[in-house]
Structure formats: structure tokens, C-alpha cells
Amino acid sequence: MSCTTAPSPGWPGWGGPTGDFKVKSRGLANSWSGKGPRQLWNRELGDGYSGILVDGNRLYTLYLDGETEVVVALEATTGKTLWKHTYPAAIKKNPDNTARKYGLGPQATPLLTKGYVVAIGWNGDMYCLKKSTGEVVWFHSLSQEFNSPVLSRGYSPSPLAYKGLILCLVGGQGHSFMAFDVEDGRVIWSKHNFKRSHSSPILINVDGQDQLIGMMDQEILGVNPSNGDLLWSHTHGLAGDLTISTPLGGQDGLVFISTAYTGGSRALQLTRSNGQTSVQELWFTKKMRVHHGNMIRLGNLVYGSSGDFGPAFLTAIHVSTGVVAWKERLFAKATLIYADGKFIVLDEDGMLALARPSVEGLTVLAKAQILEHNCWTVPSLVGTTLYVRSRKKVLALDLK
């Protein structure tokens, strides 16, 4: 488990209840009819890639409507809108052609904590809202107040909750990482001068110490989540506008990172002695290059979809050695959830599948076309209900 906080029911933020895209659901089907799993409901939704949060009978996410961003609460059983909060979101920096092609909607996944939903839009507009009503509790413009760079593809890092704090990867002089009080938005700490990337940070525990891990423009680094003190840093060397995937932590102190384009994958071994954290790079390879999808570690294997805008291969790699166990060209570029001994795979073309992973390869149990291109958002699973979105729609599916 990569997250150091207690698991939450539902799907409270990026990575789900434990922050590692693993869910303790049981009773998932091993096969579907030709039409795929039973659809409970579907509805139109505006542009964006923000994940869907689940809390009881409510869902929360963000989307773009014209030049307005919307934080919305939906009824989980019907998809009906319960409340929405809107705010102007005219793009403040000219996006590049890739961003225009693939949409200008919000990308960061919001966060549920202590009765609030915290959401960050394309321009770095951060709202804390009451989850029951959508009433604004506090607001910060990360770009205007703290000079967070608005990259050519917008703001992407998802926030984290930690002991009453909201932790954000902000970037800029003195603001690489920031911590805000969840109740009133006060800045608790703000430190470092590293430029940010699109990657979301994670929380891990290294030999008894909680650490906040973030992929920056050129470095991956760890800080103390309570005060922001720098614990360690290590160069990864790919420009921040191309660094997107989230680091993957483990209880053994291994941190796995991967980037696409000219990047690759590497494993770092973190150890603590005499109050200091040391970092050792175990290996580097270009044989696995995860773009913007997520990765999942099961035992000694890390699984992810390798490739950027060309062919994609679902890949398994030994985290301790960097040796590729297998590559399968079964899907377009894809995201993953692990539950009930199976992967739920959603590729960017809208193909949904159940597949059983092993060290030898991937056994596909069922697959069905459920949406159109492009589906880059990791689905959310609570019980046997899967919530899936594209740039146009959101679906609820029964996987039992």
C-alpha cells in the first residue's frame, strides 16, 4: 500500500481508497455477454479527464462547459445532478496543439476529505466546497497567488489529504509543494524551488517515516508532509511538460517511476539511517515507458501500458531488477484497476476488459466496447459498480 493514511470507503481521490488503484471488491464476474456488463445508467458530461469520486450515494467530478468549469455532485444510483459549482475558466495560456486536439477540460482528480470536496481546474483554480451542498468554503488561485506555472497542457496533479492538510504540487519559487489547512485554506507550509510537472504526488512510509513523493520537472523528490522539509532528491531528466504518470511506492522502500517519449522506467531504493534517507537507483530501462496512465504493483511485478502516441503494450516488469516479464499488444493505451484477483482494463478507444495477470502473461476473460475514443480517465470501482467516463459521457456498470 502506497498511502500512509487509513483506507476510506468509496473512492475518495486519485488512486482510490488506498491510493494504489487496488480495491477489495469481491464477486466480480469472470465473463460477460457480447454486449458487456449491465449498464445501470449513462448521461452526458462535459469535457475533461478528472476521475470520479464515490461517497455513499454521491459521485463528484469536474468538467468543462464552454469557458466554464463545473464541479458537480451526482446521484450514484441515477446519475442525476444534485448540485454544481461553476466558475470562469478561460484558458490563461495558449495550449499547444496536442492539448487542443485532446481537450481543454480539467485533468486533476478532486479529493474528498472531512466533509469537503477539493477540486483543482486547468488553470490551477482550487476550490474547497462542502460536499453536501457545493457551498464554497475557501479558494486559492495557484497560478495568480503562488506563481504556479500554467503549463501548455494545463494543471494535472491531484491533491492529497494528510492529517488535516491538503497537499499540492504547485511549482515555482518557494512553492514546489504546499500544504493548506483543510478547514480554512490557510497556508501551513510552502517550500522549495523545483519546477513542477503533470504528475500527481503520493504518500509512502519509509522505515517508519511518512514521506510525500513528487515527480518534478527534472527531479523526483521526497519531503516531510508535516513541514515540507526536503528529505531527498534524484534526477530523472525528462522535461516536466512530458512527465505525467504517478510514481508507485511500496512497503519495501522501492519507488518505481516511468515516463514516455524519450524517458523510461527506473527503480529507486529508499532507506533511512540516523534520521537520513538515502536513495539508490537500482536500474533504468527504456523497455517500459508509461505515458499518462496508471501503474499497479502486485508482488514483484509492476504492470502498466507502455507507449505514448504510437503502439501501446501492456507490460509487466520485475521491480527489483528491471527485467521485462512480458509484453502484450492486446489493447490500445490503457488504465488499470485491480480487484478480485483481476484487472479491470479500460483502453483509450473505450474497450473495457477483465483480465487475470500472472508472471507468464495476461489472460483476457471478457471484453466489450462501451465508449468511444478517447478514454484516458481511470475508472472508479466501489463494490461491483464501475463508474467510467470519456470526454462526453459517464456510465455506471454492474460488474457482478
Language model segments and positions:
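Blade-level signature of beta-propeller repeat domains, shared across WD40, Kelch, NHL, RCC1
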Residues: 350, 374-400
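WD40 beta-propeller blade core
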Residues: 72, 127, 178, 221-222, ...
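Blade/loop signatures of beta-propeller domains
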Residues: 7-38, 266-268
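Extracytoplasmic beta-rich repeat domains
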Residues: 40-53, 84-111, 139-161, 171-174, ...
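Short coil/turn segments that connect the beta-strands within blades of beta-propeller domains
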Residues: 56-57, 114-115, 163-164, 208-210, ...
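Short loop/turn segments that connect beta-strands within beta-propeller blades
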Residues: 75-78, 130-133, 181-184, 224-227, ...
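Short loop/turn segments immediately following the C-termini of beta-strands
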Residues: 16-19, 64-66, 122, 171-172, ...
